[in-house]
C-alpha cells in the first residue's frame, strides 16, 4: 500500500512520457513520508476514447487508495504535493486532479496475510 492509479487521455503522453509521470507520482508519494518506499505502487491507464467539455482535450486524474489512519490534513497535503509536482510538467493539460480514498485494515487482504506461517498477520510478511 498505497496504490496510485492514474487515468489519462492518451494525448498526455505528447506532453510527458508515461515513465516521467509514473516516477513523478512515485517520488512525490515517497517524499511525503507517509509510506514505506517499497509499499508504493503506481500505474497508469490511458484512454483514446473519451468526451470532455468544449475546448478541452486532455485530462489526468489520480485515484489514491491508502490504508486508513492518516489525518484529513495528511491526505490533503499528499494530493496537493502530487498535483504541485505534476502541474509544471503538464502545463497545457485541460484537467489535472487527484483524490485520496481510504480502505479499512480489517477488510484488506494480500498474499502475505493468507500465508499460514504468518501468525502475526503482518501484511509485509
What is the predicted role of each segment?
Residues 53-93:
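Mid-chain, well-packed structural core segment of small domains
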Residues 32-35, 41-65:
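Histidine-centered catalytic/metal-coordination loop motif
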Residues 20-23, 67, 106, 123-125:
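Macromolecular interaction modules
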Residues 6-44:
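N-terminal first-folded block
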Residues 9, 43-47, 99-103:
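Short loop/turn motifs enriched for small/polar and acidic residues
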Residues 2-10, 60-66:
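Short, hydrophobic beta-strand segments
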Residues 87-109:
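C-terminal structural segments of small proteins and small subunits
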Residues 109-125:
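Short, low-complexity, polybasic intrinsically disordered segments
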Amino acid at each position: 500500500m498505497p496504490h496510485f492509479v492514474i487515468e489519462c487521455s492518451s494525448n498526455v503522453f505528447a506532453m510527458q512520457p508515461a515513465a516521467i509521470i509514473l516516477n513523478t507520482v512515485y517520488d512525490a508519494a515517497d517524499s511525503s513520508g507517509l509510506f514505506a518506499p517499497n509499499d508504493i505502487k503506481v500505474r497508469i491507464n490511458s484512454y483514446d476514447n473519451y468526451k470532455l467539455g468544449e475546448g478541452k482535450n486532455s485530462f489526468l486524474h489520480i485515484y489514491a487508495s491508502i490504508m486508513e489512519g492518516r489525518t484529513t490534513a495528511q491526505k490533503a497535503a499528499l494530493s496537493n504535493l502530487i498535483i504541485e509536482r505534476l502541474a509544471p510538467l503538464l502545463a497545457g493539460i485541460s484537467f489535472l486532479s487527484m483524490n485520496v480514498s481510504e480502505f479499512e485494515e480489517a477488510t484488506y487482504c494480500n498474499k502475505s496475510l493468507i500465508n499460514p506461517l504468518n501468525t502475526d498477520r503482518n501484511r509485509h510478511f
